Amino acid sequence: MEKKMFCYQCQETAGNKGCILKGVCGKDFSTANLMDLLVFNLKGIAIIMTSMRHAGVKADYRKADKAIMESLFATITNANFDYSSIAKRVEKTFALKAELYSLALTQGIELPENEAVTMQGKPEEYDRLALSVGILRETDEDVRSLKELTIYGLKGLAAYAEHADRLGYVDEEINAFTERALHDVTMGLLSAEELTALVLETGSFGVKVMALLDKANTETYGNPEITEVNIGVGSRPGILISGHDLKDMEMLLEQTEGTGIDVYTHGEMLPANYYPKFKKYNHFFGNYGNAWWKQREEFETFNGPILFTTNCIVPPKANASYKDRVFTTNATGYPGFKYIESDEHGRKDFSEIIALAKTCQPPTEIESGTIIGGFAHHQVLSIADKVVEAVSSGAIRKFVVMSGCDGRQSGRNYYTEFAEALPSDTVILTSGCAKFRYNKLQLGNIGGIPRVLDAGQCNDSYSLAVIALKLKEVMGLDDINKLPIVYNIAWYEQKAVIVLLALLSLGVKNIHVGPTLPAFLSPNVAKVLIENFGIAGIGTVEEDIRTLIA
């Protein structure tokens, strides 16, 4: 069968081998190929930037740093489906590469004769050029696997760095590493062993970027607090905000105050409800709906406008009534959806969304009641004595980390069934949208400690690492793997990849990953991860309960 594209970066990739005609996500082949060209341009920019850094050239690297992070983010699964949007990024990166190339030459820097550095193209040439720079350009399956594992980790890292940057928090060391890693996977000079080391180094920088974003979020909006979140609806029109960007959340709440419009979170924006600064807004009503993949039904019943601040977008059905009510911003895009730009100061005008909301009916109720969350590291460590006492007394036998992503595959019912089957002396630690598989179950509590502790968004997996390291210290253990903590993680896209690599870099072993192992892991690379880190897939609920809760 003719390959019109090749992409295997997400968990739902066709046959767990790769999408070759159209993305399972809904991305058409021309857009997928254009993303390959965009990443190829970023590799060229990174090679030039790394060469200039090594030469000690004093320059304003900010423009290139932002271009790399923002464009990597735009290629994450379900972020951007808009060919024209990606084409604009390709055009800008060609221009930036030419600018940096000239600067390097004027500084007397000898640049490598690598096609990623030298390639230039006009818009009418993009489709042709894109066909020559895809993933399969690397013919060695194991080398390709290690390179793509690094790149997918970098995509997740870039997403978190971009969020922190929006709040004014930047780490130059993270930017320089990202460029060096792109340089290293492109130049073809590293052995398989060196590429494996680069994968783990990417994980260690994943820890750094999650720490940076945690600092940005908590210093800006306060430490998340234990919060009961309303999942019902009010009587006023609403705006639904989805994604991860808390800066957009802040601006939307500011601009909707006093307008008679309520604001609801959806999907990964749910944890915004836990931040103290947002609680002062009386029109911040609560959360509507569930994980990203249910949006086709939930956007219909919400009745009002929807704002995507990041992934995950699901292409709407042709007859969807909500298509004209969806807005995108930042790295996101979809043909026909309106895009909200920011000004030179990063501010956005949401007046069009607000005006539309005023013409809409209030949301239709799909559920009622409350759910509880806000168990990030500051909150949990404030009750560390209580937690340690519960472990010491045997009241809590095991903590089960079930962070990660949700998805459409029917096999993901496993995670609901697994949560229900866990013994009553276990506590689930979660973050990311995987929580929607079990955060509305009535699992009770242990001595006042809820049996599902939601730390927040996928990046708040950092909180779970902080909690684990603190418990290791308090309990006087010399190895994080001696803690009564086991890992059964659901993955979907590239932010889950950087979380996994971060855990590996911290020395965590015996992580179960599902519902399938990534297609981009070649048999030999998978073998290395299994032998050195105890990485495993999932089995049946009964088998995994026996294995993990011994």
Curated annotation (Swiss-Prot):
Gene3D superfamilies: 1.20.1270.20, 3.40.50.2030. GO terms for cellular component: cytoplasm. [4Fe-4S] cluster binds at residues 7, 10, 19, 25. The modification Cysteine persulfide is found at residue 405. GO terms for biological process: response to hydrogen peroxide. It is an enzyme of class 1 (oxidoreductase). Its main location: cytoplasm. The keyword 4Fe-4S applies. GO terms for molecular function: 4 iron, 4 sulfur cluster binding; hydroxylamine reductase activity; metal ion binding; peroxidase activity. Binds 1 [4Fe-4S] cluster. It catalyses: A + NH4(+) + H2O = hydroxylamine + AH2 + H(+). Keywords: 4Fe-4S, Cytoplasm, Iron, Iron-sulfur, Metal-binding, Oxidoreductase. It holds the Pfam family Prismane. It is found in: Cytoplasm. Its cofactor is [4Fe-4S] cluster; hybrid [4Fe-2O-2S] cluster. Its EC number is 1.7.99.1. InterPro entries: HCP/CODH (IPR004137), Hydroxylam_reduct (IPR010048), Prismane-like_a/b-sand (IPR016099), Prismane-like_sf (IPR011254), Prismane_a-bundle (IPR016100). It comes from the Bacteria. Hybrid [4Fe-2O-2S] cluster binds at residues 244, 268, 312, 405, 433, 458, 493, 495. Catalyzes the reduction of hydroxylamine to form NH(3) and H(2)O. Belongs to the HCP family. PANTHER family: HYDROXYLAMINE REDUCTASE (PTHR30109:SF0). This is Hydroxylamine reductase.
